[in-house]
Amino acid sequence: MCGIIGYVGLDDAKKELLKGLQALEYRGYDSAGIAYCQPNGIKTIKTVGKVSCLKDKVAKEAADDVTTCGIGHTRWATHGGVSDTNSHPHTAGKVTLIHNGIIENYKELQEELAAKGKEPISQTDTEIAAMVIDDCYTGDPEAAIRKAISKLVGAYGFCIIFSDIPETIYAVRNGSPLVAAHTDRGSIIASDMVALVSHTKHYFVLKEGHIAKLTKDEIIVKDENGEVYGPYIHHISWDMASAKKGGYDYFMMKEIHEQPEALRNTIRPRMVNGLPDFSADGVGDELFTDVNRIVITACGTAMHSGLMGKNMIERLCRIPVTVDIASEFRYQNPIIDEHTLLITVSQSGETADTLAALRLAKERGAKTLSVVNVKGSSIARESDYVLYTHAGPEIAVASTKAYSVQVAVMYLIAFRFALVNGKISEKDAVGFMKTMIDTVDKVEDALTYDQQTERIAKRLTSATDIFFLGRGLDYALSCEGSLKLKEISYIHSEAYAAGELKHGTISLITDNVPVIALATQPDVYAKIISNVQEVRSRGAKVILITGADASVDAALCDYHIVLPETDPLFAPFVATVILQYLAYYVSVEKGLNVDQPRNLAKSVTVE
């Protein structure tokens, strides 16, 4: 969740650290700080607020400082409140470190340190970790780190500098990701490759338990046994321009408009002779045989793509599919075995709960397939098979294009699974693929609905509650629409299967409560219209979204959005844009920061 950057090289470390922290701002944070080497020790500057506040403080307090080695951090408070004292970096004795993660046994460690007369200054688990490393330090940094992490329980990504070993950064991780690169200007390490891309196109992922030593001349990585290890080098396929707004006010709007390209990039490489095909991904048909049950596990938006996948896979493949919240999966003693296919979905590939679910499934012998956007991520590496979504970098906290391509991959899995197991013919599969790629043109058409949805959004900003209704595929999409709205507009919102109205939900419907109803599926159209009539009769303000061929009584709704003509099976791809627009414009109208909603982080790397 937090942002980490470390630099040692030929250039001004303060400048490089601040630049890196600015690149990591999209992850969400409440304070920021840097620490860097000086002739008389380590100097630390940190503050509550944005990186711009830190930049001003550095300019005021350290304009003349010359340094070529340092570490920087953006903090999202987990242990201890938001304050300068609790901000990172933290120092204990000769150790200064930054940390992404949560140390679960920090209280026990704090008690052990207190018995030695050592007390923390802050309220954070991170300072305890620094104190433990310093307590273990007798002049050999790698030995101290190795001994200290043997005492830690939890997730962590540490970057560490020792005051008596200048111009050197040490790093180690467990759970929380770290990526690093060496160039002719020095070495850099970060929690996210977006902080590296201005330096290089090549990087490696630090493995769990491995210790990296960064100097201006090289990076040396040692495994758990202290043996030097040569990491696999990955290539970044996008550039810094892709991670900039490109003329849009917010990244979210830019990323909404990038969906057609992302969908084509995800679908077309998996079309061979018109058929769905994963051979280029190294995913053979053996994955889809001898499977009697599929479990999809994910968090948030990724889980909603799983709901879409469940609907399509069960519809076409006639095999039972469950969708489990990853944070619950491990604790319910799931029923999985060698005939289970576990599909994990994660944009970052580092979502802690999803990674834990994957590891449990592998322990129990399940086949595992991951759907991720980031190459070389932990979930991708640890899965038996991986299907990459080709969304490119997604900077806004609220996911848009990553969701759409996740749904696209779910559809592709359904098509291939059904074809391999004889549930659909090749002719059917070709038809599905053609319609799917044609639907991308309809997604582009939906992008022209911005003014219409903006006008409607302006009527929703004063609402305290907004409800979404749908059935089947529309219900699955309603869940995502509701999440998108609440996370960036701060308006309470819930999505309901429309048939559940009579079972309690309808008691919440009063005069002028907005209800957004999705009615794109002909097989349940009459039912959803009946539900709309129910809320309408109780005074709801109804926004109705339908297909092009739907016949709608004008008195049934306050606003009617008619989608471009689309095959109903693929209508959710088009309707997704409308729901994203509504959430975006409500947030903008309220004057909120669309890209960085409060209390949220882009990548949740702690449980």
Language model regions located:
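Conserved short alpha-helical segments that host acidic/polar catalytic motifs at enzyme active sites
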Residues: 1-245, 249, 261-292, 331, ...
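Generic C-terminus detector
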Residues: 226, 541, 556, 566-607
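Glycine-rich phosphate-binding loops that contact phosphosugars or nucleotide phosphates
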Residues: 289-438, 518-564, 582
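Glycine-rich oxoanion-binding loops at beta->alpha junctions
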Residues: 68-85, 272-286, 309-345, 492-508
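Hydrophobic alpha-helical scaffolding
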Residues: 7-10, 99, 119, 135-138, ...
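Structural beta-sheet core signal
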Residues: 4, 36, 160, 171, ...
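Active-site phosphate/pyrophosphate-binding segments
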Residues: 259-263, 267-295, 385-514, 587-607
